[in-house]
Design a protein with these regions (language model features):
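Conserved "right-hand" nucleotidyltransferase catalytic core of DNA-directed polymerases
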Residues: 1-17, 22-23, 30-39, 115-118, ...
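Conserved RNase H-like, two-metal-ion catalytic cores of nucleic-acid enzymes
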Residues: 1-108
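Short alpha-helix plus adjacent loop in nuclease-associated cores
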Residues: 92-120, 126-136, 146
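Short, polar/flexible loop-turn hinges at active-site or ligand-entry regions and domain interfaces
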Residues: 47, 82-90, 101-103, 119-125, ...
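Surface-exposed charge patches
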Residues: 75, 112, 180
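Catalytic-loop motifs flanking and including active-site residues across diverse enzymes
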Residues: 73, 110, 153-156
């Protein structure tokens, strides 16, 4: 029987280096970006929290991987492979528990989903306080707080999966996978043709402006 692992990355962010403003690939490729922690919790009792370079990625091979918002964590993993940040492995599946709980009628966020499912309040103040802080500049107390926060997120991700996975239809799973794959692949664009047509459009716009009889005159 294959093992299921919940996985969660913790990354540097600030007002400029932010996925909210840059999108996934813009964020991951930002010069200030740093994926300094990964937490992994398995349904076999396995736990890891630390730098991604210290994690044994091979244990994910032929296993199911879960992330709460896999469009972030899986996409970061795939991007990191292209940058040689960590090893390439082949999980059996990578499921998004955020998509799962939404399909099951729960709020999408981990905080609100666990509040409704388990009447459990979890604080996101640690994540808020991580803004603008690099791992190497955090004091030891805050480092431990971040580690505990990361592990808790993975534990709750796994718990939601164990309780709601049977209620998640195959149809909704397929939609989740296809949407995420489409985002990761992006849109195919012929950039040379785009630039050529943009220049042609600018030239045509200039010609049209020159044909306006009162063009270039000051308004009365």
């Amino acid at each position: 029987m294959e093992t299921t692992y919940a996985l969660d990355f913790e990354t540097y962010y600030d007002k400029d280096c932010s996925i909210r403003h840059l999108g996934p690939l813009g964020y991951f490729s930002h010069p200030d970006f740093d994926a300094y922690m990964v937490s992994v919790v398995g349904d076999n009792g396995y736990q890891f929290v630390g730098h991604p370079k210290d994690f044994d990625w091979s244990i994910l091979t032929d296993s199911d991987v879960l992330s709460h918002n896999a469009s972030f964590d899986e996409t970061l993993y795939l991007y990191g492979v292209t940058q040689n940040w960590w090893a390439e492995v082949k999980p059996l599946n990578w499921f998004c528990t955020a998509d799962m709980v939404a399909a099951c009628g729960l709020p999408r966020s981990l905080k609100n989903a666990t509040a409704q499912a388990y009447n459990m309040e979890i604080s996101k103040s640690t994540r808020d306080n991580m803004s603008g802080k690099r791992w190497e500049t955090m004091d030891e107390d805050f480092k431990r707080e971040v580690e505990e926060y990361a592990l808790k997120d993975s534990e709750l991700c796994l718990k939601l999966w164990q309780d709601y996975n049977p209620k998640w239809s195959q149809f909704e799973r397929d939609i989740s996978r296809m949407n995420r794959t489409a985002v990761q692949r992006g849109l195919p664009i012929n950039t040379d043709l785009l630039a050529k047509n943009l220049n042609a459009l600018k030239e045509k716009l200039f010609e049209c402006e020159q044909n306006i009889p009162w063009g270039g005159e000051k308004p009365l």
